[in-house]
Amino acid sequence: SSHTIKNYEDEKEKVFREILQKKGCEVVDISVGYNTFTTEKYQDAAARAFETCNDMDGILGVDMAAAACMREAQLRGRKVPEDLSIVAIDGTYITKIGPEILTAIVQPIEEMAQKLVSMIISQIEGKKIEEVESIFGVTVQSGETC
């Protein structure tokens, strides 16, 4: 059987944007596109972010984007977290390999993977998958960037 895959990222971004805008914040989206995993793409996006809005005071992005923005901030003389906060989303090892530990919203990736594998095995075995949507809790990794 086939299932329509809903992209919750778009929904989360929409709600995040709405909340910030209600608080009077300007939100600028700098995208690298879906399924982009090269450091060059993230470094290019970080450079574009600083060229587009050099006076920004906060950045939220996946781990690779946050790390690239941290590097770009240092190259441009921006002080983190004094005048620019950077928060990563995912909380993988990438947040811990630079000179500063990135503040991060940590997703339970192992738990998510186990759930997905279990669903795939059930589908292979011909079992009906009752629960196609799962909500996982997140934690905050205190770092040095926010």
How should these model regions be labeled?
Residues 47, 51-60, 64-146:
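Flexible loop/turn connectors
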